[in-house]
Amino acid sequence: MFNQKNFKIIKNKDIEINTYIDGEGPLVIMAHGWPESWYSWRHQITSLVKNGFKVAVPDMRGYGKTSKPTEIDAYNIMELTSDIIAIADEMKVDNFSLIGHDWGAPVAWNTSLYHPDRVNKVCGMSVPYVVSKMPPIETMKFLFKDVFFYMIYFQEEGRVEKELEQDMRKSLIAVY
């Protein structure tokens, strides 16, 4: 169903972004969340292509066949939004629509904020757009307080890796 020839590695500086590209028409870029991959969008890809759109669907930075930098700062929102812009640049389009799900939603919101001349439509699912004077992680801590929220959990360097790697089977069952 999804032809291997439709995958392209798109460069953003030293990052290689594995991207599924298909269709003809206005460009729609779709950013997945955690713990997902480009394949999470398979049903939307089929429908969008069938209805006259071109899609570019990456494995986001750190996932799948896309580069996985070890430095934490390589995953800051400016770097993630630059990956989206690199995809649009490679597609040679000035304007595109952007859909983000879960962790892809903040990437979509921020790409549209930092590049309003490029993003003509934006949709974020599962994570709403929040205006706050606090840094995003502080806003999340305030909103979720003592409730488990994975985005806060993942801020603790080393702890997550240790806990998830203890029992991979149990971790995968808990996640999915």
Task: Please report, for each region that a protein language model flagged, where it lies by residue.
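Active-site donor-binding loop signature of nucleotide-sugar glycosyltransferases
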Residues: 12, 60, 127
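Short acidic-hydrophobic surface loop/beta-edge motif
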Residues: 6-12
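Short polybasic/polar patches that bind polyanions
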Residues: 11, 49, 89
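Flexible "cap/lid" subdomain of the alpha/beta-hydrolase fold that forms the substrate-access gate
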Residues: 2-4, 17, 27, 63-99, ...
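A short helix-loop-beta-strand connector motif used in the catalytic cores of GNAT acetyltransferases and
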Residues: 4-6, 37
